[in-house]
């Protein structure tokens, strides 16, 4: 990396949306203090990003016994949020962590409710779980995700094979949501 990339800032502002965009690429043990100080001074209401990057900063905060900045929520996306990561992130930021699941093509979107259950959002897309021959599978059986986007007006995706495998389940939920549940 060039000398310029080894020193702050490792972020840029999106003034139109009042966002601070921090580089995951430049996160290193020696740079974490800069990230911490910038986050603390910016005081975001929400922290949104890769679980691995947020976890790395959270671990630094916990292990260094830093003062806590408490956002309203931490939202993770684009990677699997592992239980040990969630625990450290919650400990560092003293707030709930909401995980999201989707794809760049905007073919589908899912998120966790406050009870930790991952729901697809039917206003966003139509989801099917199919076998290798594109036949629909009943709830509880794992198969390939096929999605029809209801929001991408630029490039409509109809029965788009996402490449992910999962199952949907029928479940009585505390949250009383009727949205499909990922099993």
Predicted segment positions?
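Short, flexible, mixed-charge acidic loops at enzyme active sites
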Residues: 6-13
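Hydrophobic alpha-helical hairpins/lids featuring a short glycine-rich hinge
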Residues: 1-2
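Active-site glycine/GP-rich loop and adjacent strand/helix microenvironment
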Residues: 14-183
